[in-house]
Amino acid sequence: MNIKSLLLGSAAALVAASGAQAADAIVAPEPEAVEYVRVCDAYGAGYFYIPGTETCLRVHGYVRYDVKGGDDVYTGSDRKGWDKGARFALMFNTNSETELGTLGTYTQLRFNYTSNNSRHDGQYGDFSDDRDVADGGVSTGTDLQFAYITLGGFKVGIDESEFHTFTGYLGDVINDDVVAAGSYRTGKIAYTFTGGNGFSAVIALEQGGEDVDNDYTIDGYMPHVVGGLKYAGGWGSIAGAVAYDPVIEEWATKVRGDVNITDRFSVWLQGAYSSAATPNQNYGQWGGDWAVWGGAKFIATEKATFNLQAAHDDWGKTAVTANVAYQLVPGFTITPEVSYTKFGGEWKDTVAEDNAWGGIVRFQRSF
């Protein structure tokens, strides 16, 4: 056997061996395609599909810092220094289509911090601890402000009362409820009918609200009941609501009208009446039988909006507030505001001073 024959035989043997090993080799599977996040534009900006589902999710919120000085326009007391408050609000919306309509949820978590020189106003923080923050100090708290489910016109969960939401709240000022218009957060079951001609109606069963000093929740099986009617068009809107409080067995009602004078200037007026002439109730929290609120908004430029609100109640409280909301850059707004309250009539005996002047500057980054 010559060397050439030996080399050819060795090469043939190596090829045969490698072929046998290849037959037994494990072939790695192809990696699955990655499902990237898809934009969902069916419900507005900021939504995306939750991977693997047809549910759209939006995550948004704001960071806010307030600095207050002067008098407390709610109580008439002198702050004797600066009051500060911070809030981080985180919001989640989900929406998907079903055979019964749009199925949605909304939740809002609030992380609050307050550092007050002389008192607290209840706007920030959880004041359930042992410290007397009414005399100054620091308080923090976490709050589940909203958590509700919607299906078509049906809504159930934690929300704000239809006595406020259906008629459109008050004005676009920070100190809007010096003359109070009712409690806000409540558990509720509600149904809203929306017609195609601008007409809508609502009926709601509510648990009632509470604040730092008072609890207006129901004390049995009978819920608070709210009903309302609204008509809206290009000119503006008119809305009315009636509420029954089973705890005190009294009722309250209000009517609001909004008029768009131009595309930049609008005015509104609201009147309310309660069968119980006391602020200590869930809905008619103004003083006396009746109260009125009114205001105006003027969009001066793309960055600056002027807001004005005035209110007066049967017991003699008058409150006026004005501000300028200035958008420094998109998503960041600075709002200086000044407020005045005159405590007349029956309110004189409940406050330290008859006249109160206060100011606030709010810095808010929304995302």
From Swiss-Prot:
<comment type="function">
    <text>Forms passive diffusion pores that allow small molecular weight hydrophilic materials across the outer membrane.</text>
</comment>
<keyword id="KW-0406">Ion transport</keyword>
<keyword id="KW-0813">Transport</keyword>
<keyword id="KW-0812">Transmembrane</keyword>
<keyword id="KW-0472">Membrane</keyword>
<protein>
    <recommendedName>
        <fullName>Porin Omp2a</fullName>
    </recommendedName>
</protein>
<comment type="similarity">
    <text>Belongs to the alphaproteobacteria porin family.</text>
</comment>
<comment type="subunit">
    <text>Monomer.</text>
</comment>
<keyword id="KW-1134">Transmembrane beta strand</keyword>
<feature type="signal peptide">
    <location>
        <begin position="1"/>
        <end position="22"/>
    </location>
</feature>
<dbReference type="GO" id="GO:0009279">
    <property type="term" value="C:cell outer membrane"/>
</dbReference>
<keyword id="KW-0626">Porin</keyword>
<dbReference type="Pfam" id="PF02530">
    <property type="entry name" value="Porin_2"/>
</dbReference>
<dbReference type="GO" id="GO:0046930">
    <property type="term" value="C:pore complex"/>
</dbReference>
<keyword id="KW-0732">Signal</keyword>
<dbReference type="InterPro" id="IPR003684">
    <property type="entry name" value="Porin_alphabac"/>
</dbReference>
<dbReference type="GO" id="GO:0006811">
    <property type="term" value="P:monoatomic ion transport"/>
</dbReference>
<dbReference type="GO" id="GO:0015288">
    <property type="term" value="F:porin activity"/>
</dbReference>
<keyword id="KW-0998">Cell outer membrane</keyword>
